[in-house]
Every structure is written in C-alpha cells, then in structure tokens.
Amino acid sequence: LEKAPIRWKAITYLLIDTGCRRGEIMGLKWSKVNLETGLIIIDCALLYTESKGIYEGPTKTNDFRAMKLAPQSLAVLKEWQKEYENLKELNGDRWEDSPYVFVRDNGAPLHPDSITRWQSNFSKKHDIPPIHPHAFRHTAASTMIANGVDIVTTATELGHSSPTTTANMYAHQIAVARAKAADVRAGVFANRK
C-alpha cells in the first residue's frame, strides 16, 4: 500500500481508520475536513444508480458524525491534498470543480464503486486475497471492541443508528472482549497473596 497512488492510498487509510462506508468516504468534502486538527465531518454519501448516475445522498442513517483521524491517516490525506492541488493546476479550465475530497484527475467525482475495483486490482497485482472495502469497516469495529471501546462509542463511530445494531453485528467480538475482561478481573485475585 505504501507504493500505491496517493489518491487510493488516502482512501484506503481513511476506510481503515474510520470504519466509514465507501460512499461516505467518497462523499467527504474538503469543507468538512480540518487538516490542522484532523477532524472530519461525515454527513453525506456519494451514491450511484443507473437512473440517477452519481449523486449525493444522506448517510445510511441520515445522520452526521465528527471523527478524529489518526496522525498517519491525516499525513496521507495531506499528501493527497497537495496532489489534488497539482491536478487542479495542471487541468486549468478543464478542471471540473466539485466539493469532494476524492475526485478523478479532472476534478469530477469518483464513482462510488471505483474503490472496490481498485482494491480488487490491487489484490490481484499483489497476489493477496481480495479485500472488499466493507471489510475495513468490520475490522475497525472489531478493533475498537477488542480494545475496550464501549458499544455506544463504537456504534457512534460507525454511524449505526443504535448500539443494538452494533451489538447484534459484532456479538462474537463482544463475547471475546467480555471473556478478556473476566480474565483481567480474575487476575486481581491471582496477584493477591
């Protein structure tokens, strides 16, 4: 991934870091990104249907959330922002001005499915099992739960409408985390003499 084109590297970092849906990442706007603090606002999604083409719609839960990026993701996003500005300058009058962070070389919005195609090609090129963008969402959720992030915060970070949704989807990871908690509590007695 380190040698991947910066646009795709940044998209992948954000998918891994935030656990956002691919449409939410594709719908991220520069006006909702603070490159100083690393705070982003997820408040829409870029979607596609044959009848409408590419269009902006609400998030799945019709809500918004603020998220703080990891320093590594922020650094890669800043690299992409420089490349974005270079592309804008190179294209001049041909640049299609759109508000989105992730665009094609001419400034037009990326198709929401393009990340799936890119990751499929990346997997084939590097002879690794195919990774669907939604797998990063599951990884983010599992990582938060395994590291003790409470279910309400995990649900909020993922943009789930209810912690119950999160609990139902990640019941196995929650069971593992609870077993780990029991082991930690048992350790209190083991260390007493």
Language-model features: locations:
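A short, basic/aromatic helix-end/turn motif that makes direct DNA contacts
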Residues: 27-33, 155-161, 171
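Short, basic (Lys/Arg/His-rich) helix/loop patches that form interaction surfaces
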Residues: 1-9, 18, 67, 83-93, ...
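Basic, Lys/Arg- and aromatic-enriched nucleic-acid-binding interface segment
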Residues: 1-28, 35-36, 47, 63-64, ...
